[in-house]
Amino acid sequence: MDDIYGIIPVSKFKECKTRLSPFLSEEERENLLKVMLKDVTDTLRKYTDKIIIISADEDVLNYAKSLNLSVLKENDNSNLNKALKQAMEYCKGKTKKVIIMPSDIPLIGKTNLKMVIDSSKQLDFIIIPSKGGGTNTIIMKPLAIRTKFGDFSYKEHVNAADRKNLNPQVHDSLFMALDVNTTEDLGEIIVHGENTETRRYLKELKINVESVHGSERLKVTRGS
């Protein structure tokens, strides 16, 4: 049996990151998701036995195959948590643990992911929060809890792990908490994302950032 598999659910490319419209076009948003997925999987593959991309989108699955990743076609009439259940059912009996994370945390390489994964060998449940009370990563045995990804899922996941006596351990990571949804998030990638495919792509789009004082800490603009 393998030690750990990565599970990454990916939504349809053409429906992704609508909050970045009109700052980025549909094609640019699709390309952004591709480079972010590459950044995430390039880091994750160093520390996992297999990475599984689950999606209902054939374009996503074909792109994942081009990155030499394993793929699962999401069942019909599914949603995020049902898709994760499907992926974990596939993993059960094949691997001791799974690490579940989104495709839009391109700064993952700046955290000590090896340390987190190594510690999971002695711990039953590790959770990494996202900004705003969500969850960006869970490491656990397949199907150890029923996932509740969505708004304010962090507390729900911790409570679910407590009910199963899994002694949940929280790992705070600035870089893994940053999932990309807004133009200010793009600015954070410009500031912190040196040596990432995502930052290189944003610079190709002539996206610039400057520090400001106010409710928005970063001013993000596009050059001509």
Curated annotation (Swiss-Prot):
Keywords: GTP-binding, Nucleotide-binding, Nucleotidyltransferase, Transferase. Its EC number is 2.7.7.68. SUPFAM superfamilies: Nucleotide-diphospho-sugar transferases. It is an enzyme of class 2 (transferase). Gene3D superfamilies: Spore Coat Polysaccharide Biosynthesis Protein SpsA, Chain A (3.90.550.10). The keyword Transport does not apply. InterPro entries: CofC, Nucleotide-diphossugar_trans. It catalyses: (2S)-2-phospholactate + GTP + H(+) = (2S)-lactyl-2-diphospho-5'-guanosine + diphosphate. Homodimer. This is 2-phospho-L-lactate guanylyltransferase. It comes from Methanobrevibacter smithii (strain ATCC 35061 / DSM 861 / OCM 144 / PS). The gene is cofC.
